[in-house]
């Protein structure tokens, strides 16, 4: 899946960080709480990291999932936040990739910021991806991307 966000950063600004927050989990038919999936994140075609989702969650209604959505289907995910700055890439405040930093993303020279989320061909756990938006899951938010600059 690829999302394109408008880039409002001027090429005269210095980008300090990019932050992203989203609710997601693995994907299988119906749901399966123990169903790992290796989900890889890219920004502007630069690979950032791979996170292994532990499962495709159901068994109870998500806090914001509509009553019309069947209980036999995926209901909620995990809220994950990552940040790219001069020190590298952090996931939930833990450094996961010190080899890519904010300058590698070339944000100032692009009209859009491209976020790609996928299961790579060589992934060990190929369990698919569920991404939740506003009014679904346990967190009432869409994908949130913010860029800090000076």
Annotate the PLM regions:
Residues 1-62:
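Mid-protein regulatory/catalytic core that forms ligand/cofactor-binding pockets
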Residues 18-20, 101-103, 108-122:
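Short, well-structured beta-strand segments within conserved domains
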Residues 16, 79, 143-145:
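Generic hydrophobic, helix-prone segments enriched in Leu/Val/Ile
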Residues 2-4, 83, 112-116, 144-146:
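Ser/Thr- (and often Asn-) enriched beta-sheet segments in non-cytosolic proteins
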Residues 118-150:
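Proprotein-processing/basic-patch segments
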Residues 46-51, 68-70, 142-146:
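Short, surface-exposed, polar/charged, turn-prone segments marking secondary-structure boundaries
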Residues 53-108, 124-127:
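Extended, solvent-exposed segments with strong compositional bias
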């Amino acid at each position: 899946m690829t999302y394109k966000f408008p880039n409002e950063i001027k090429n005269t600004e210095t980008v300090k960080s990019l932050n992203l927050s989203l609710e997601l989990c693995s994907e299988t038919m119906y749901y399966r709480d123990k169903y790992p999936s290796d989900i890889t994140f890219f920004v502007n075609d630069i690979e950032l990291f791979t996170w292994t989702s532990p499962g495709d969650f159901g068994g109870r209604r998500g806090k914001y999932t509509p009553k019309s959505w069947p209980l036999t289907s995926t209901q909620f995910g995990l809220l994950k936040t990552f940040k790219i700055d001069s020190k590298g890439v952090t996931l939930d405040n833990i450094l996961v990739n010190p080899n890519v930093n904010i300058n590698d993303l070339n944000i100032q020279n692009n009209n859009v910021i491209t976020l790609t989320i996928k299961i790579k061909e060589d992934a060990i756990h190929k369990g698919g991806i569920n991404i939740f938006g506003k009014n679904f899951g346990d967190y009432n938010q869409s994908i949130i991307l913010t860029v800090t600059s000076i």
